[in-house]
């Protein structure tokens, strides 16, 4: 039903019923085409058009539609139809271009994902499939690959505030721009910090549409390894704010943006820096209990049903590809998308991922036994969403 009825609007409004399913493409081997084809394998979390959930692969699918309709790559189309007319001369899709520019920001992150204070330098996120010389962008490109500057992004903001017009040329119809900027899918609560200044939450097409101190606010944030961005507009004030930072998963962009907007509006009492700091502290403090709730209650004094060597092998899932389990020196190791982590025995045939830098750190996975008495599958909540539950990875026979 969904395949027969889904529209471009559904893709851009994140209302297909699919949860994020991000883990398979982060450092994954898929091409852009394979990413989109993989949508057919994904388990939905909700019925079609009943629930909002951000879904990056759906945005990639919309980008692929541009390629199918124009005969150009998404990168070629955006460069010719957006970057060049707007004069966005320092915007690119390629990590190589950034690293070749002496005036570029270095990406940073926290020392570990569980530490709130401190920083460490990290590498740029670069897909193995990215090839600037051949004009091939990252597979996930349409969902988040543009690297830019404040000055270039302000040109993009001005273009939006001018309803698709640059100079005397209407690049996108005013009607289309208004469709993108209006509420298309209601949200029951804010994505991040609840605050008294905001009382309406929805999603347009590629934009969050909210109210802020009585004004319609159109905004969108983004995070990718070592960088955070927030673009915000108050259309009735012809006000646009772009906040960029070279720090991973930073909420400072919101505190800074709301403070700037308040000063322009003449509003007082926001105290955004302290409020966001308190919110982030609460988020971090809640993480251990959230992880505990995701895992089964541990049963002490148990042991695996098989020798560790019997668990080793390759396990495959249609959506997520391969998990490789290795037995080394009396320990099991878990490898997914080139990242290897140690497994600790949890209870019976359930093991826990022990790697503070791993996406799945602290999560448990369980091995299933087939009718032949052999280890035959892994059951793992890799979708990171209780609406989907566990995915089954079947052991590949040699």
List the predicted regions and their residue ranges.
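Peripheral terminal and inter-domain segments
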Residues: 187, 196, 258-398
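Contiguous hydrophobic, core-forming segments of folded domains
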Residues: 235-269
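Short, well-ordered beta-strand elements
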Residues: 219-220, 230-233, 237-246, 377-380
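A structural signal for short hydrophobic beta-strand segments in well-ordered beta-sheet cores
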Residues: 108, 207-209, 231-233, 324-325, ...
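Short, surface-exposed loop or secondary-structure junction motifs
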Residues: 1-225, 230
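Structural motif
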Residues: 212, 234-236, 328, 347
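A short acidic/small-residue loop/turn micro-motif
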Residues: 225, 248-250, 359, 383-384
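Structural beta-strand/beta-sheet cores of well-ordered domains, especially the beta-sheet scaffolds
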Residues: 89, 203-205, 216, 227-231, ...
């Amino acid at each position: 039903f969904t395949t027969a009825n889904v529209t471009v609007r559904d893709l851009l409004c994140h209302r297909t019923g699919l949860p994020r399913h991000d883990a398979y493409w982060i450092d994954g081997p898929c091409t852009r085409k394979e990413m989109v084809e993989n949508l057919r394998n994904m388990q939905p979390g909700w019925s079609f058009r009943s629930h909002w959930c951000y879904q990056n692969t759906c945005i990639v699918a919309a980008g692929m539609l541009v390629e199918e309709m124009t005969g150009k790559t998404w990168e070629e189309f955006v460069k010719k139809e957006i970057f060049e007319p707007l004069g966005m001369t320092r915007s690119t899709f390629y990590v190589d271009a950034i690293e070749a520019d002496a005036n570029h920001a270095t990406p940073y992150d926290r020392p570990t994902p569980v530490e709130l204070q401190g920083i460490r330098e990290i590498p740029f996120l670069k897909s193995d499939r990215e090839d600037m010389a051949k004009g091939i962008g990252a597979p996930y490109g349409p969902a988040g690959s543009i690297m830019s500057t404040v000055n270039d992004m302000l040109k993009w903001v001005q273009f939006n505030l001018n309803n698709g017009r640059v100079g005397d040329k209407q690049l996108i119809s005013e009607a289309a721009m208004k469709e993108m900027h209006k509420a298309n899918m209601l949200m029951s609560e804010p994505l991040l910090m609840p605050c008294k200044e905001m009382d309406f939450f929805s999603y347009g097409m590629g934009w969050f549409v909210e109210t802020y101190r009585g004004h319609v606010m159109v905004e969108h944030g983004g995070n990718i390894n070592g960088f955070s961005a927030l673009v915000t507009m108050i259309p009735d004030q012809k006000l646009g704010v772009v906040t960029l930072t070279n720090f991973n998963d930073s909420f400072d962009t919101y505190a800074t943006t709301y403070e700037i907007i308040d000063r322009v509006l003449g509003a007082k009492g926001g105290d955004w820096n302290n409020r966001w700091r308190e919110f982030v502290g609460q988020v971090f403090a809640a993480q251990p209990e959230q992880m505990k709730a995701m895992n089964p209650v541990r049963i002490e004094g148990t042991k695996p049903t098989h020798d560790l060597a019997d668990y080793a092998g390759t396990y495959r899932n249609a959506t997520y590809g391969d998990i490789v389990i290795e037995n080394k020196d009396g320990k099991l190791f878990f490898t997914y998308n080139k990242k290897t982590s140690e497994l600790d025995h949890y209870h019976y045939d359930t093991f826990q991922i022990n790697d503070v830098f791993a996406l799945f750190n602290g999560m448990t996975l369980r091995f299933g036994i087939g009718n032949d008495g052999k280890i035959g599958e892994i059951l793992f909540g890799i979708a990171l969403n209780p609406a989907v539950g566990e995915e089954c990875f079947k052991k590949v026979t040699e």
